[in-house]
Amino acid sequence: MITVTKEKNCITVKGHAGYDEYGRDIVCSAVSVLTYNLQESINRLTDDTVGFCYAPGEAVISFGDVSAAAKLLIDSFIVGIEMMSFSYPGNVELTKH
């Protein structure tokens, strides 16, 4: 199960989807693409400084006050994760605090 936790100044992505074997897991791939796209979009399209920390099975995205553009990108990431959790409820879980 991949758990995505959205807090005021942090998003944590943890775990493995377990949808298919390693290298063939489309759910894991989709969440990874959403996460990497968020990082690159904020870096390329805004002047905001956002922290990204990656480790095997975990990504932590930390931010303070961000521009409207970065907030929109973060909100778009959350929409993508919500869609994944609706389509694959046994593999992706979103929690908002």
Predicted segment positions?
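N-terminal intrinsically disordered, cationic/polar leader segments
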Residues: 1-26, 35-97
